[in-house]
Amino acid sequence: MQVNETLAEGLRHEFQVSIPAAEIAAKADERLDDLKDKVKINGFRPGKVPVSHLKKLYGRSVMVETIEDTIRDTNMQIVNDRGLKLAGNPKVTMPSEPKEIEDILAGNSDLSYSVAIEVVPPIELADFKSFTIEKPVVDVSDADVDEAVERIAEQNRTYTTRAEGAKAENGDRITISFKGTIDGELFEGGSSEDILVVLGSNALIPGFEEQLVGAGVGETRTVKASFPGNYADSELAGKDAEFETTVSLIEAPEELKIDDEFAKLLGLEELDQLRQVVREQLSAEFARAMRQHVKRALFDRLDETHKFDAPPTLVEEEFEQVWKTIMAEMEKEKKTFADENTTEEEARAEYRRIADRRVRLSLVLSEIGEKNGITVADDEINRALISRARQTPGREKEIWDYYQRNPQALAQIRAPLFENKVVDFILELATITEKSVTREDLFKEHEAHSAEM
């Protein structure tokens, strides 16, 4: 076998490979010899089929398989012998002339091909003991608990039908049907039947609910309102509309009583238990947000201290995946780049930067895990998979089987487990400082930087 490197430019390497025809033929004969013990052919006893006869029947397909396996094994040998780390699958170029291919398959010519590979650059890891990471700290206050309990109570508020002839007031729940028009024409999504609206909740576009205060059951009003300039559907944003709206039911809110009886309606023993459950839920919610903040701060430090050229192919793949998601969201919400105060060119540049960062961080985390023996055990993956399957009651086995059949999907279960293990490893070495922040600041920061995680 001859291997000549024809290009070594940055992270790209190309090789010209030549493997003697005799070597390929010997491997193919080994396959055929192994095959004779497995196939059943009329007129021959098991294991007694002559190789020459097998070659007539299966010679071409066996040669194709032999060549494919030889190319794969040779490419891995090239990579391993040079201490390289692949960034993606090798790209093989075979001879273009049909006669050359036929000669190789017939065993009359050496197997010659070229292979291009892209590699991961050497990564020199930072001293994680020098890292200082700030952790925001938010304690669950009694006011937070009160607010959450009141929200739960509001969601479970009961209503009673108002007396005949009553007029709708703020706070009432009304049932309405409407047909919306713009410039006299019906528009998509502008009509609805029998929807519940609490007057004053601002669930509908600005100005809509106010015009129904004072309406009675059976009354139809023409509601004039404008869609906000930042409305999700850009085709409706900023436009004036009219809605022929009919009220079919008016219900008055009953008094909210947040007491032991209310807690029992929710399946709990008393109000104190409800408050404790809410406090624990808020604590878990805050902890997740604080964890995300710490991870982002850590990733920022890893980004700052590990500057290298990421493999272009990996960056392009990550960018295409991100961009596809962005475009799908924009199409769904009928938004344009102008709606986001940017241009497509600027957006592409920003998301390509994010893709480059994600790829570099992924490679750094992988290097840290490899050098420090950080792994994810099968039972950890299985527990995560069971948890995922339980999110779709009744389809647990279907979900489980899907992941077992799809290694790439299973890798998506493993990835966050591995990432969290590496993050915990670094945080054990780093210095963590705490800073008290408000709940609002914690979640505002979390939302602002979620795209780069």
UniProtKB/Swiss-Prot annotation:
GO terms for cellular component: cytoplasm. Its EC number is 5.2.1.8. It catalyses: [protein]-peptidylproline (omega=180) = [protein]-peptidylproline (omega=0). GO terms for biological process: 'de novo' cotranslational protein folding; cell division; chaperone-mediated protein folding; protein transport; protein unfolding. Gene3D superfamilies: 3.10.50.40, Trigger factor ribosome-binding domain, Trigger factor, C-terminal domain. One of its GO terms (molecular function) is protein folding chaperone. InterPro entries: PPIase_dom_sf, PPIase_FKBP_dom, Trig_fac, Trigger_fac_C, Trigger_fac_C_sf, Trigger_fac_ribosome-bd_bac, Trigger_fac_ribosome-bd_sf, Trigger_fact/SurA_dom_sf. Keywords: Cell cycle, Cell division, Chaperone, Cytoplasm, Isomerase, Rotamase. PROSITE patterns: FKBP_PPIASE. Pfam families: FKBP_C, Trigger_C, Trigger_N. It is found in: Cytoplasm. SUPFAM superfamilies: FKBP-like, Triger factor/SurA peptide-binding domain-like, Trigger factor ribosome-binding domain. Residues 171-256 form the PPIase FKBP-type domain. Its main location: cytoplasm. Involved in protein export. Acts as a chaperone by maintaining the newly synthesized protein in an open conformation. Functions as a peptidyl-prolyl cis-trans isomerase. Consists of 3 domains; the N-terminus binds the ribosome, the middle domain has PPIase activity, while the C-terminus has intrinsic chaperone activity on its own. HAMAP family: Trigger_factor_Tig (MF_00303). Belongs to the FKBP-type PPIase family. Tig subfamily. This is Trigger factor. It comes from Nitrobacter winogradskyi (strain ATCC 25391 / DSM 10237 / CIP 104748 / NCIMB 11846 / Nb-255).
